[in-house]
Each structure stands twice: as structure tokens, then as C-alpha cells.
UniProtKB/Swiss-Prot annotation:
Site feature (Transition state stabilizer) residues: 75
Binding positions for Mg(2+) per the UniProt entry: 153, 179
Function: Catalyzes the reversible retro-aldol cleavage of both 5-keto-4-deoxy-D-glucarate and 2-keto-3-deoxy-D-glucarate to pyruvate and tartronic semialdehyde.
Annotated residues for binding of substrate: 151, 178-179
Single GO molecular function: magnesium ion binding
Gene from which this protein is expressed: garL
Record family assignment: Belongs to the HpcH/HpaI aldolase family. KDGluc aldolase subfamily.
Listed NCBIfam families: GarL, PRK10558.1
Catalyzed chemical reaction(s): 5-dehydro-4-deoxy-D-glucarate = 2-hydroxy-3-oxopropanoate + pyruvate; 2-dehydro-3-deoxy-D-glucarate = 2-hydroxy-3-oxopropanoate + pyruvate
Active site: 50 (proton acceptor)
Organism field: Escherichia coli (strain ATCC 8739 / DSM 1576 / NBRC 3972 / NCIMB 8545 / WDCM 00012 / Crooks)
Protein name, per record: 5-keto-4-deoxy-D-glucarate aldolase
Pfam annotation, one family: HpcH_HpaI
Chain positions of site Increases basicity of active site His: 89
Length: 256
């Protein structure tokens, strides 16, 4: 039986520097995720860091996206091999790794997603990702089809951006604007010139190493500016933000 995720089209699109417009999924619900999957986004982040997600909530959401053209990307809660292994086994192939501050942390993220001898991923012969043992040549195919996107969101990460971007197996550099703003002394103000300068610097250094860059930008003007600066995978909103904004607007229409 063939697995329809091989080859990984999202990974190929990033390598080809094709613009990929995405959305954040934070509601942790298969119905809302399914709706997002019908909207036409190129990729969707299922958030395991700041949203109330775990293995039991991720699986129904992956099922809900089975027929969608939107590539599911999981943001892991932390850069830890056992957590990453479990998310691989349930069927994720695209990973967003938070707080990568050094080349060594980038290398750990890559190694955690590869089977030996290329990495340290633990081996199970039957799990959801290999359709319970029915995918031919799964081990080799998996190693070639994992996407690793690393988040730079601290001063140390900015300082080490060249080493991180040059790491073999890293497919893209993603900026975490809120944490980066906090790290630079501008908590709650990602629009501060210092933060914007750092973001543009990260984009430029990623490009210098032939790596695409991305960011979360729910404000349209910000998203368009980042695209002009060379970002190629940009999340332009979140299900939670759209839901809150739309329901507030609807209530205000009749209550004010």
C-alpha cells in the first residue's frame, strides 16, 4: 500500500522557494481543523506549544486533514527526541521546532526525525505513519521526506543564525516575533524597529544560506511586508483569532 505523503510536496515547495501561505490552528478541534483544511491554505500549524494539544487531540485533526491539500505542520512543545518520535509515529512529517538557539540544537532536531544511521529516531515497525506496517520502504522514504523548520526567537538565536541556517537537514528558518520581541526588551511590541531589524536580518541570513524563511503575521500589512522582504512561508492568521474577531464583530453589530 502506498502512503500519499510521499513525496512530501510541502518540503519540495519550500526547496523551490515557492510562496506558501499558511494559517495557525490553535482551537485543538478536528471540526475547526477540517474547516481550515477546506479554505485553501498551503500549510497549517497544529500547535503543541501554546495550544491545548497532545497525541490524543492531534490524531483526530490529522484524520480531518486527510483529504486536504493543506500540509499539516506540528509545532512541538519542546525540542525533545521522545516527543518528536511520538509525533512522527502518529503521522506528522513537517515539524516546527521552537527556541532553536544553536547549531547543536538544530542538529538535535534533525537527528530526532531520522532513523539510524542518519539520526536517533526509535524504530517501530507498525504505527499510524507507516499505515501499520503496510508502506513499502517506509524507513528510507521517511528519512527523505521530513521537513524541519526551526524557530529563532531569542538574541542567542539571532547571533547564531548563520550556523543554524547552515545546518544540514534544516529546511527553513521561522521567526517567532512575540518571543523575539520579548528577548530584545520589547515585550508585546513586535513592531518595534529593533525587532523588525532583527527579523529582516534573519530573513537575509537564511536566504544567504539558500534556506527559506517564514513567520506568523496575522496583520495583513505585516504579512505583505515580510513577503516583500523575502519570506516564503507566512502564516497569515489563526483559527482562534478569526473566530474571536468574527464573533465579536457579529455581537457588536447587534449589541452596540
Amino acid at each position: 500500500m502506498n502512503n500519499d505523503v510521499f513525496p512530501n510536496k510541502f518540503k519540495a515547495a519550500l526547496a523551490a522557494k515557492q510562496v506558501q501561505i499558511g494559517c495557525w490552528s490553535a482551537l485543538s478541534n478536528p471540526i475547526s481543523t477540517e474547516v481550515l483544511g477546506l479554505a485553501g491554505f498551503d500549510w497549517l500549524v497544529l500547535d503543541g506549544e501554546h495550544a491545548p494539544n497532545d497525541i490524543s487531540t492531534f490524531i483526530p485533526q490529522l484524520m480531518a486533514l486527510k483529504g486536504s491539500a493543506s500540509a499539516p505542520v506540528v509545532r512541538v512543545p519542546t525540542n525533545e527526541p521522545v516527543i518528536i518520535k511520538r509525533l512522527l509515529d502518529i503521522g506528522f512529517y513537517n515539524f516546527l521546532i521552537p527556541f532553536v538557539e544553536t547549531k547543536e540544537k538544530a542538529e538535535l532536531a534533525v537527528a530526532s526525525t531520522r532513523y539510524p544511521p542518519e539520526g536517533i529516531r526509535g524504530v517501530s515497525v507498525s504505527h499510524r505513519a507507516n499505515m501499520f506496517g503496510t508502506v513499502a520502504d517506509y524507513f528510507a522514504q521517511s528519512n527523505k521526506n521530513i521537513t524541519i523548520l526551526v524557530q529563532i526567537e531569542s538574541q542567542q538565536g539571532v547571533d547564531n543564525v548563520d550556523a543554524i541556517a547552515a545546518t544540514e537537514g534544516v529546511d527553513g528558518i521561522f521567526v517567532g516575533p512575540s518571543d523575539l520581541a520579548a528577548a530584545l526588551g520589547h515585550l508585546g511590541n513586535a513592531s518595534h524597529p529593533d525587532v523588525q531589524k532583527a527579523i529582516q536580518h534573519i530573513f537575509n541570513r537564511a536566504s544567504a544560506h539558500g534556506k527559506p524563511s517564514g513567520i506568523l503575521a496575522p496583520v495583513e500589512a505585516d504579512a505583505r511586508r515580510y513577503l516583500e522582504w523575502g519570506a516564503t512561508f507566512v502564516a497569515v492568521g489563526s483559527d482562534l483569532g478569526v473566530f474571536r474577531s468574527a464573533t465579536q464583530k457579529l455581537a457588536d453589530t447587534f449589541k452596540k
